């Protein structure tokens, strides 16, 4: 059952309250490079990013906000550490959300200033706790950044905002340990109704990062926990978007094209791996709620993938196009991709 959380608005995007799970990413261009940041922001929106975050390390970086906002329609999140004045300036510049931990910005007067401005401008705040940011007192209590330590830290930061009647809060608790990550989100889901931003931190390069994120994020979503997500990868941020969307698709939480393909065997008589990769690339920007199959042989292909809306299956130098398990065309191997895309266009 889906955990129903409080709903907040990041710009024009709903987070929580039963809204569809959104996919986020973060700019990795230096904040001093405004032109490059704008270019990457536009590319990430095109790739399907729904909420975009940018590091705002100093006052000069605040200039990024209006420059990026002018070119994209998705909300921009200011990622801020320690300096409460940056949060105030980011709010004035029109961010859709601030990411800041109130316990790290000074005394009550500073927390109150940020809470007041964000409340007036209807800007939510994401509290972002990770295993490297847990307070020393909490670490001493638990001995390590355990799931309970992460949860306690997040609730501590939330209480600082609640003191000043600010409750438009999103919470994330990220660990590089998948097991700790999952347990932390399970605990926080039971102890508050704030929307949860899912992610596994410091997952590594593309291959291992995708594996850890799929398990850490996907297992929580499958149990109804989570309202928005970011897949953190040491890679092109566009890969974060693709992976996040794929996780949602695999769980049936978003529409769009689903690609299935067989693992190949000794009966395969075409370059199925090459064909499957080409089909995947061709489907990248197809906006249809369909399932497409790429199968290796005519013996099992149409039958095994009969639930697919469309598919291809290979033979010796040729292949079949099938629709809902029924063969509709036979074409030479070299024409399989084009023939498949023609049929997809007809749907």
Language-model features: locations:
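Active-site mouth loops of central-metabolism enzymes
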Residues: 18-36, 55, 74-82, 138-151, ...
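Hydrophobic or amphipathic alpha-helical targeting/insertion segments
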Residues: 85-126
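Glycine-rich, proline-tolerant flexible connector loops at the mouths of alpha/beta enzymes
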Residues: 33-34, 45-69, 99-107, 169-178
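N-terminal amphipathic alpha-helix/helix-capping segment at the start of soluble metabolic enzymes
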Residues: 1-26, 119, 281
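Catalytic alpha/beta core domains of metabolic enzymes, predominantly
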Residues: 129-130, 138-284
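Glycine-rich phosphate-binding active-site loops on the catalytic face of alpha/beta enzymes
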Residues: 50, 94-108, 200, 223-237, ...
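Hydrophobic faces of well-ordered beta-strands that scaffold small-molecule active sites
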Residues: 21-27, 52-54, 76-80, 98-100, ...
């Amino acid at each position: 059952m889906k955990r129903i959380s409080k709903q907040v608005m990041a710009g024009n995007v709903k987070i929580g309250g039963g809204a569809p799970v959104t996919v986020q990413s973060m700019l990795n261009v230096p904040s001093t490079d405004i032109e490059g940041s704008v270019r990457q922001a536009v590319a990430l929106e095109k790739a399907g990013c729904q909420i975009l975050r940018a590091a705002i390390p100093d006052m000069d970086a605040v200039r990024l906000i209006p420059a990026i906002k002018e070119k994209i329609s998705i909300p921009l999140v200011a990622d801020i550490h320690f300096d409460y004045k940056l949060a105030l300036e980011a709010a004035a510049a029109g961010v859709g959300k601030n990411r800041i931990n109130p316990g790290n910005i000074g005394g009550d007067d500073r927390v109150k200033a940020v809470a007041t401005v964000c409340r007036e401008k209807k800007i939510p705040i994401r509290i972002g706790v990770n295993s490297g940011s847990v307070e020393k007192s909490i670490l001493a209590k638990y001995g390590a950044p355990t799931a309970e330590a992460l949860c306690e830290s997040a609730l501590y930061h939330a209480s600082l905002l609640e003191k000043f009647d600010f409750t438009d809060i999103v919470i994330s608790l990220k660990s590089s340990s998948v097991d700790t990550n999952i347990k932390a989100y399970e605990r926080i889901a039971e102890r508050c109704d704030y929307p949860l931003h899912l992610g596994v931190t410091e997952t590594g390069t593309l291959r291992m990062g995708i594996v850890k994120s799929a398990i850490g994020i996907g297992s929580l979503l499958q149990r109804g926990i989570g309202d928005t997500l970011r897949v953190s990868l040491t890679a092109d941020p566009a890969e974060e978007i693709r992976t996040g969307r794929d996780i949602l698709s695999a769980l049936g939480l978003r529409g769009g094209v689903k690609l299935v393909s067989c693992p190949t065997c000794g009966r395969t008589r075409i370059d199925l791996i090459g064909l499957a990769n080409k089909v995947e690339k061709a489907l990248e920007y197809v906006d249809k709620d369909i399932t497409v199959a790429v199968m290796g042989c005519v013996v099992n292909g149409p039958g095994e993938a009969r639930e697919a809306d469309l598919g291809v299956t290979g033979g010796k130098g040729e292949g079949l196009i099938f629709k809902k398990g029924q063969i509709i065309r036979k074409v030479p191997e070299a024409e399989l991709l084009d023939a498949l895309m023609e049929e997809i266009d007809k749907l």
